[in-house]
């Protein structure tokens, strides 16, 4: 019998498949879309993600970056926090996904072009997409059909505006070896170096408007990028997605499907890869229910810092002070940057 049936062939699902294969489990990935899969993503791997991917034998191409720079979108005031434990890596989503899929295939993971929607489980096994396995790992993204089908999606918080992400690539040489986060009154723009001649720009916002209209809120950045757009715009959202639990019988959730706060801290991939390892460890030990607490402990810092930043972002008097405060307290800002690496 299959040990792990993984629903979803994105980074979280593939990291789980690799962890499982390295632990000696029989793993099958059900993913209806062909590789590589492109999605809206900030495309910045924090140092922790780079280290963990290397430990899995995954070699990812990209452009290193040394830290994070906050920039006031109007005045240009900036604050910098450098990583203390090695560089991060700007890598296109398609390159990352291809590298993960290649490593999984090398380890004997089987890929089937199937979509998982309905799930049936008993005390001994779970059945989905015509397959039976000991466990199902739902790594099917932000709007997880498995989570929704099992009635495990938590309702959105009232009076809290939904936020969305928009991403586009530009054929511009990176002007910095840092990921820049530009702050405007209502949105943030993330500039990630991806190659010697390419950067990615991801805008996070509560306003539903076209990418160029969003970018206009950052005049210095918009002027610098004018005429260099190289790819269509990709979008994602609403970003905040609640999950009632991470373990439901023989179904376990990982990555965005396990619940997501916001992309503000850029820590989603690190958490996904780390949680994938904990999930496999718990399953292999015969204690899948222990994964719930493991996930909560792993994600605690990410959730706390992200919620704190969002709380400040939503307050008109506090939001304009985020960058000046970071510039005034460089050691505190650097500590916060390194809290999540």
Residue ranges and their predicted role:
Residues 118, 207-282:
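FAD/FMN-dependent oxidoreductases across multiple families
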Residues 25, 58, 109:
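Short phosphate-binding/catalytic loops that engage adenosine nucleotides
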Residues 5-9, 18-41:
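Glycine-rich FAD pyrophosphate-binding loop
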Residues 13-14:
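N-terminal Rossmann-fold NAD(P) dinucleotide-binding loop
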Residues 7, 138-139, 253:
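Redox-cofactor binding/interface segments in oxidoreductases and associated redox assembly factors
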């Amino acid at each position: 019998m299959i040990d792990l049936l993984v629903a979803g062939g994105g980074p979280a699902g593939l990291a789980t498949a690799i962890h499982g294969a390295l632990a000696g489990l029989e793993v099958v990935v059900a993913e209806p879309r062909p590789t590589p899969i492109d999605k809206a993503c900030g495309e910045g791997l924090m140092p922790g993600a780079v280290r963990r991917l290397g430990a899995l034998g995954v070699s990812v191409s990209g452009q290193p970056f040394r830290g994070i720079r906050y920039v006031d979108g109007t005045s240009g005031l900036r604050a910098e926090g450098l990583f203390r434990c090695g560089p991060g890596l700007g890598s296109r989503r398609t390159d990352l996904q291809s590298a993960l899929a290649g490593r999984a295939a090398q380890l004997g993971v089987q890929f089937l072009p199937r979509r998982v929607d309905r799930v049936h489980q008993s005390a001994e096994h779970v059945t989905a997409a015509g397959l039976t396995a000991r466990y199902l790992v739902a790594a099917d993204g932000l709007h997880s059909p498995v989570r929704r089908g099992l009635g495990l999606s938590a309702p959105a918080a009232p009076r809290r505006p939904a936020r969305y992400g928009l991403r586009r690539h530009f054929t511009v040489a990176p002007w910095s070896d840092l990921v820049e986060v530009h702050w405007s009154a209502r949105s943030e723009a993330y500039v990630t170096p991806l190659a010697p001649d390419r950067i990615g720009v991801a805008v996070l916002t509560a306003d539903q408007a076209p990418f160029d209209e969003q970018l206009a809120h950052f005049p210095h950045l918009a002027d610098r990028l004018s005429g260099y757009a190289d790819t269509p715009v990709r979008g994602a959202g609403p970003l905040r997605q609640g999950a009632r639990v991470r373990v439901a019988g023989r179904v376990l959730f990982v990555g965005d499907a396990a619940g997501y706060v916001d992309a503000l801290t850029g820590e989603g991939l690190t958490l996904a890869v780390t949680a994938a390892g904990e999930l496999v460890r718990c399953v292999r030990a015969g204690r899948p229910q222990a994964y719930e607490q493991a996930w909560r402990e792993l994600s605690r810092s990410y959730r706390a810092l992200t919620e704190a930043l969002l709380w400040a972002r939503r307050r008109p008097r506090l939001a304009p002070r985020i960058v000046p405060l970071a510039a005034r307290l460089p050691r505190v800002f650097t500590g916060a940057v390194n809290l999540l690496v």
